[in-house]
Amino acid sequence: MIEALLVATGGFFGAITRFAISNWFKKRNKTQFPLATFLINITGAFLLGYIIGNGVTTGWQLLLGTGFMGAFTTFSTFKLEAVQLLNRKNISTFLLYLSATYIIGILFAFLGMKLGGI
């Protein structure tokens, strides 16, 4: 039961944080590129890598990794925004968004793990 509570608590704060950051960026950046989701997912990849690399206890992994990072990052919004770019026939931004998110996300997760100690 405590594990579920840790995940739920982390998820609550992760979702609220993503909502706030996403709205802040969208109000200030009027661009075709989905900058808010991109930065949230890259930051989340780095932080999750750092959490895992740091060797934190299972409780902290559940709270911060599964809960907070699981709700903070967003695979579904990433895919939706990519499809919307395609529907608007914005192929160059679509390709940039897809490739940058995957490549930079993996690099930042690796960097987080290295800085965390793995």
Swiss-Prot record:
Q: Where in the cell is it found?
A: Cell membrane
**Cellular component aspect of the GO annotation:** plasma membrane
Q: What activity regulation does UniProt give? A: Na(+) is not transported, but it plays an essential structural role and its presence is essential for fluoride channel function.
- Membrane topology according to the record: Multi-pass membrane protein
Ion transport keyword on record:
yes
Q: What is its main location?
A: membrane
Question: InterPro entries attached here?
Answer: FluC
One Pfam match: CRCB
Q: Where are the transmembrane segments?
A: 1-21, 33-53, 55-75, 91-111
Q: Which GO terms describe its biological process?
A: cellular detoxification of fluoride; fluoride transmembrane transport
A Gene Ontology molecular function term for this protein is:
metal ion binding
Question: Keyword annotations for this protein?
Answer: Cell membrane, Ion channel, Ion transport, Membrane, Metal-binding, Sodium, Transmembrane, Transmembrane helix, Transport
Q: Which reaction does it catalyse?
A: fluoride(in) = fluoride(out)
Instruction: Specify which residues bind Na(+) according to the UniProt entry for this protein.
Output: G70, T73
Tell me, in a sentence or two, what this protein's role is: Fluoride-specific ion channel. Important for reducing fluoride concentration in the cell, thus reducing its toxicity.
Name of the protein this chain belongs to: Fluoride-specific ion channel FluC 2
